[in-house]
């Protein structure tokens, strides 16, 4: 029978209509069309060099593929579910256009290694774009951190006021996280950038192919060195999705803080209206929908990671149809991450800082208590003793409803005669910050140095 399939020759009846739609992937894998064409053109050039195809065949394939690519970009290409996937759609259109030369293109190649090559080309391109968007978000954070290098705010542990930091220093923590994220993506790219083409179905091919030449044409650093592994490996997709999950986790943490800081009870920041929505019933509401949705989408991306792990956990070598299910989680992860990074960079530039609210919060939580303990240690008091002294000082301030810095000197000296008038130099938020003038510290001078260091790194990234 002839069912218009590349493999229909050995079957006695056509595929059931429901099976066609159930097994087809063209509705979502068509996004790989340009990468599939790149791979096919390199394969054709290699086959010509090896003497398998003629120069006439190569010219016809190049011309046909160019026309197909134009049709796809212009939205004129008609995709067919009957042809299953992007690869067979492109091949059928090519054969219709150029005849036998199109039929020869698949020589020495299987859809197994063809698909694996297309995914790697797609993901390599996606990683390069994602790293660029990560850098863009880092730059936006630096733009907000720079004018707030000395803006006092409370640092928290257990969501309780702990010690004074600066808002710039707090933002730099996320710049550091994103820096690691970019490094992970770039490291993942090394393992993505290996060519499976030439592995054929699973055992290689009998044709005199030159895989290293194909790799060179496509910009791959190396070839996959085991044909079984080449067609069945999806580690690179899992690794990418794990790295993407970490990016989303970091942005989810920042989202949680933005939501908290924007709440009227805290009021540290305001987010521009264009990133918020209102309520259909409560006229006063301004809801931080973007950070809330980012927080939700972090779970979505992590779910894709779990889906890919479960997909691969029990597959025998080599290729199995299960692997068709790798694409939707992967594609959605790429889309979600890129959209999130782009919108986040814009949103950070739409944040208004409320320094007075931040400073007021510092003064409400005895944030300089540790500074008083350190002050006593420097006077010769063992730290555990100074800890006890300061704890009793805090109790007194609580009773009087004031900050430690508001206690008169004579009352402070009741706890230790080593306390002198210079203690007030360390009990203010600014005094506390100034003492932490070391690499990684929150002193404004250090914050400015870290901002300059990151700007230099991004300029050379």
Curated annotation (Swiss-Prot):
A single GO cellular-component term on record: cytosol
Entry EC number(s): 4.3.2.1
Pathway as given in its UniProt record: Amino-acid biosynthesis; L-arginine biosynthesis; L-arginine from L-ornithine and carbamoyl phosphate: step 3/3
Keyword Cytoplasm in record: yes
InterPro entries: Arg_succ_lyase_C, Argininosuccinate_lyase, Fumarase/histidase_N, Fumarate_lyase_CS, Fumarate_lyase_fam, Fumarate_lyase_N, L-Aspartase-like
GO biological process terms held by the UniProt record: arginine biosynthetic process via ornithine; L-arginine biosynthetic process
Catalytic activity: 2-(N(omega)-L-arginino)succinate = fumarate + L-arginine
Alphabetized UniProt keyword annotations: Amino-acid biosynthesis, Arginine biosynthesis, Cytoplasm, Lyase
Compartments where located: Cytoplasm
Molecular-function annotations in GO: argininosuccinate lyase activity
Assigned protein family: Belongs to the lyase 1 family. Argininosuccinate lyase subfamily.
The protein, known as: Argininosuccinate lyase
Source organism per UniProt: Laribacter hongkongensis (strain HLHK9)
Gene: argH
């Amino acid at each position: 029978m002839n069912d218009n399939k590349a493999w229909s020759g050995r079957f006695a009846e056509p595929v059931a209509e429901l099976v066609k739609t159930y097994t087809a992937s063209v509705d979502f894998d068509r996004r790989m069309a340009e990468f599939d064409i790149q791979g096919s053109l390199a394969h054709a050039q290699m086959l010509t060099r090896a003497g398998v195809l003629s120069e006439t065949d190569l010219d016809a394939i190049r011309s046909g593929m160019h026309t197909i690519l134009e049709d796809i970009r212009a939205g004129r290409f008609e995709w067919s579910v009957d042809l299953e996937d992007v690869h067979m759609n492109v091949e059928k259109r090519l054969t219709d256009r150029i005849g036998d030369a199109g039929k020869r293109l698949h020589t020495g190649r299987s859809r197994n290694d063809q698909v694996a090559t297309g995914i790697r080309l797609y993901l390599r391109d996606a990683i390069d774009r994602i790293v660029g968007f990560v850098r863009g978000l880092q730059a936006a954070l630096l733009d907000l951190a720079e004018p707030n290098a000395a803006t006092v705010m409370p640092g928290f542990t257990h969501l309780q006021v702990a010690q004074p930091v600066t808002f710039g220093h707090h933002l730099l923590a996320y710049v550091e996280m994103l820096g690691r994220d970019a490094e992970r993506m770039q490291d993942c790219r090394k393992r993505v950038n290996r060519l499976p083409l030439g592995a054929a179905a699973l055992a290689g091919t009998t044709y005199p192919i030159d895989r290293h030449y194909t790799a060179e044409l496509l910009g791959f650093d190396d070839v996959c060195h085991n044909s079984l592994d080449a067609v069945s490996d999806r580690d690179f997709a899992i690794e990418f999705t794990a790295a993407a999950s970490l990016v989303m986790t970091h942005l989810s943490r920042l989202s949680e803080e933005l939501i908290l800081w924007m709440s009227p009870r805290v009021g540290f920041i305001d987010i521009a209206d264009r990133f918020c929505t209102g309520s259909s019933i409560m006229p006063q509401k301004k809801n931080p929908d973007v950070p809330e949705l980012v927080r939700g989408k972090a779970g979505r991306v992590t779910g894709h990671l779990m889906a890919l792990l479960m997909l691969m956990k029990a597959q025998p070598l080599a290729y199995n149809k299960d692997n068709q299910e790798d694409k939707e989680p992967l594609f959605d992860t790429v889309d979600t991450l890129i959209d999130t990074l782009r919108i986040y960079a814009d949103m950070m530039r739409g944040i208004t800082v409320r320094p007075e609210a931040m400073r007021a919060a510092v003064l409400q939580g005895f944030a300089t208590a540790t500074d008083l303990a350190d002050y006593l240690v420097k006077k010769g008091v063992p730290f555990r003793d100074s800890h006890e002294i300061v704890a009793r000082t805090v109790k007194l301030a609580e009773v009087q409803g004031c900050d430690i810095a508001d206690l008169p000197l004579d009352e402070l000296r009741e706890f230790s005669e080593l306390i002198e008038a210079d203690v007030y130099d360390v009990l203010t938020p600014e005094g506390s910050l100034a003492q932490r003038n070391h690499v990684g510290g929150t002193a404004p001078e250090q914050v400015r140095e870290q901002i300059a260091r990151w700007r230099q790194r991004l300029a050379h990234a």
